[in-house]
A protein has these predicted regions:
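Short beta-strand-to-loop element that shapes/binds the nucleotide-sugar donor at the catalytic cleft/hinge
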Residues: 1-13
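A recurrent flexible, glycine/aromatic-enriched loop bordering the glycosyltransferase active site
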Residues: 7-9, 24-43, 56-58, 64, ...
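Short aromatic-enriched loop/helix-cap "lid" or pocket-rim segments at secondary-structure transitions
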Residues: 10-17, 89-92
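Short, hinge-like loop/turn segments at secondary-structure boundaries
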Residues: 16-22, 94-97
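Short glycine/proline- and charge-enriched loop/turn segments
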Residues: 18-27, 49
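A short, conserved alpha-helix in the catalytic core of glycosyltransferases
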Residues: 41, 46-51, 56-88
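Nucleotide-sugar-dependent glycosyltransferase catalytic core
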Residues: 57, 85-108
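Non-catalytic, C-terminal membrane-associated alpha-helical segments of glycosyltransferases
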Residues: 98-104, 108, 112-203
């Protein structure tokens, strides 16, 4: 099982929208598929002793493990009631490299997923416009429009670099893992509104 991840006003707003897409407010127990994240997760000791992370991967080792477990008959649960703040304090080159590493790993996990240059342009445009609309709707002042564009550019250019080899295209898989969320329900997530986590000593 794994829990919800959220950001606050110290996070890039674009990343907060990514969290809202992958970590919605409603639990799924069990969920479909093998998406998960080990930043906030739990696994039976008996399962872990015989199923460990693939340390050769450049990222997404949690998803790769979940894929193996689902194939073996296990199930993955998403628990929205167990949230954590997840922050990335990164420069723009670091943002790009993180998405590049994840895309390289995704090639090993889902080799049918391919991102073209046209996909990159479409994703950058649609995601950035979506960020701008959502930020205006939620009264966000902590991230500038330029920063949202920069984030999305580095996100998708990094993903393209890591996923540049031509592969059999699965439109459904590509839509799920690369394309921006367009649901109005997602943009109404309470954690997309202006908020900042309290200092640790305040509980």
């Amino acid at each position: 099982s794994y829990g919800r991840q959220i950001g606050d006003d110290d996070s890039h707003y674009s990343e907060r929208r990514i969290f809202a897409k992958y970590y919605p407010a409603v639990s799924q127990i069990p969920q479909e598929g093998f998406f998960c994240n080990n930043a906030n997760s739990a696994l039976l000791r008996s399962v872990w002793t015989s199923n460990v992370f693939d340390e050769e991967l450049t990222g997404l080792e949690d998803m790769e493990l979940a894929k193996r477990l689902v194939r073996a008959g296990h199930r993955v649960a998403y628990v929205a009631e167990a949230p954590v703040f997840h922050h990335h304090q990164e420069s723009w080159p670091q943002v790009r490299r993180r998405f590049e590493r994840e895309a390289i790993a995704l090639r090993a996990i889902m080799p049918e997923v391919h991102l073209s240059r046209i996909d990159v342009l479409r994703c950058v445009l649609e995601s950035t416009l979506g960020d701008w609309r959502s930020a205006k709707r939620n009264g966000i002042k902590s991230s500038s429009r330029l920063d949202m564009l920069r984030y999305r550019w580095n996100q998708y250019v990094g993903s393209y670099i890591g996923n540049h080899e031509h592969r059999v295209l699965s439109r459904r898989a590509k839509q799920k893992y690369f394309f921006p969320e367009t649901s109005k329900d997602t943009d109404q997530d309470e954690w997309l509104k202006s908020v900042r986590r309290p200092p640790a000593h305040e509980g």
